[in-house]
Amino acid sequence: MKYQKPKGTADILPPFSKEWQFVEQNARETFALYNYEEIRTPIFEKFEVFSRSAGDTSDIVTKEMYDFDDKGGRHIALRPEGTAGVVRAFVENKLYGPEHQKPVKVYYMGPMFRYERPQSGRLREFHQIGVEAFGSDSPKIDVETIMMGMDFLKKLKVSGLKLVINTLGDKESRDRYRQALIDYLEPHFEELSDDSKARLHKNPLRVLDSKDKNDQKIVENAPEILDFLTEDAQKHFTSVKEELDTLGVDYVVDSSMVRGLDYYNHTIFEIMIADSPLGKGDVTICAGGRYNGLVEELGGPEVSGVGFGLGVERLLLLLNAETQTTLQSKQLDFYVVGIGDLVQNDVLKVVHELRQMNFVTEQDYLDRKPKAQFKSADKLNAKYVVTIGESEMNDRIFKLKDMHSGEERTVALSEINTLKDLLK
């Protein structure tokens, strides 16, 4: 029987795993500058964690969730996104308590699962990097979150970034807008797609996010949320814009933009790039916003949150296309060639000592002739080759060859520590 990976998954093989490490390390370095720390939550949660947070009408819950009953009869779901599990952990571990400095700032990275049609950059098992900050109602944390996403992408040298923002207002704003949207859409009910018909009275804002072309035409002239904001909601959004202006950040306000998850309110944003391998026109590579009711929804007190998420696979597609090359593995510092059976203990010691000095070091494991070992050193692009034969062993020395210049010299085994300065 021929075994293959499940549809919609991928094997991340060397040397491409280095690209993932590169992205993850840059994320960690960027987030640390903003005083964020890593959080790790389970890959699966109780189904209700996602159904209550994402919303019963969201595509994630109605179409895309991997859920099942386990052997104990518990309804379990593989996580389709990162925020809900982080919020659950925040509530369960009482991170809202007075002993924890506010805002609580965390980031996460790891696999997520959605049953979607696999396509380039969109798999059923995909990887997400995200951040969440809890405990501040200030527009400053909204702006900080946006800037952190921008800084991360700029650190990766992604060019042509476009920031799009909107507000979904507070509860009163949304209630007023919700009714206005229903009043506008009801006369078009029979023209709407089946999905939008089902959402009209449950969450009409999701109709604005429909991918159906006819739905998109209908909502072109729909009322805009900016006309229904309360004074407080307007003040919050104005502060966000003013702070972005202060930082010299260009942005576009798109009043029709909503988020695919039901828990967002106030500031939402997307960081886009135009005409890339991800698609023609503006394509979103990072998205997020504020969610002031989600902690309460999952059993906690009234605590606000704000965050973003981005897909690693899509980001790597973009990075590789922009650089026209894949990231290289760290170059091999030393390849140690052993000639003859009698020298193998010395080879073992030299390899070990070089690694203790933090040099990337390799040796032969296949009992090959010296010529084959030198070929391996060349293929692995080693900077230096150490050669130990029986005569070198007897004289307690080894030969050191610079593979770039071809220069070769002799080094005493007792002076191997002098190589510490060799690659500085």
Curated annotation (Swiss-Prot):
<dbReference type="GO" id="GO:0005524">
    <property type="term" value="F:ATP binding"/>
</dbReference>
<dbReference type="GO" id="GO:0006427">
    <property type="term" value="P:histidyl-tRNA aminoacylation"/>
</dbReference>
<dbReference type="InterPro" id="IPR004154">
    <property type="entry name" value="Anticodon-bd"/>
</dbReference>
<keyword id="KW-0436">Ligase</keyword>
<comment type="similarity">
    <text>Belongs to the class-II aminoacyl-tRNA synthetase family.</text>
</comment>
<dbReference type="InterPro" id="IPR033656">
    <property type="entry name" value="HisRS_anticodon"/>
</dbReference>
<dbReference type="InterPro" id="IPR004516">
    <property type="entry name" value="HisRS/HisZ"/>
</dbReference>
<dbReference type="GO" id="GO:0140096">
    <property type="term" value="F:catalytic activity, acting on a protein"/>
</dbReference>
<keyword id="KW-0648">Protein biosynthesis</keyword>
<keyword id="KW-0067">ATP-binding</keyword>
<dbReference type="InterPro" id="IPR041715">
    <property type="entry name" value="HisRS-like_core"/>
</dbReference>
<comment type="subunit">
    <text>Homodimer.</text>
</comment>
<dbReference type="Pfam" id="PF13393">
    <property type="entry name" value="tRNA-synt_His"/>
</dbReference>
<dbReference type="InterPro" id="IPR045864">
    <property type="entry name" value="aa-tRNA-synth_II/BPL/LPL"/>
</dbReference>
<dbReference type="InterPro" id="IPR036621">
    <property type="entry name" value="Anticodon-bd_dom_sf"/>
</dbReference>
<keyword id="KW-0547">Nucleotide-binding</keyword>
<dbReference type="GO" id="GO:0004821">
    <property type="term" value="F:histidine-tRNA ligase activity"/>
</dbReference>
<dbReference type="GO" id="GO:0016740">
    <property type="term" value="F:transferase activity"/>
</dbReference>
<dbReference type="InterPro" id="IPR015807">
    <property type="entry name" value="His-tRNA-ligase"/>
</dbReference>
<dbReference type="InterPro" id="IPR006195">
    <property type="entry name" value="aa-tRNA-synth_II"/>
</dbReference>
<protein>
    <recommendedName>
        <fullName>Histidine--tRNA ligase</fullName>
        <ecNumber>6.1.1.21</ecNumber>
    </recommendedName>
</protein>
<dbReference type="GO" id="GO:0005737">
    <property type="term" value="C:cytoplasm"/>
</dbReference>
<dbReference type="Pfam" id="PF03129">
    <property type="entry name" value="HGTP_anticodon"/>
</dbReference>
<keyword id="KW-0030">Aminoacyl-tRNA synthetase</keyword>
<keyword id="KW-0963">Cytoplasm</keyword>
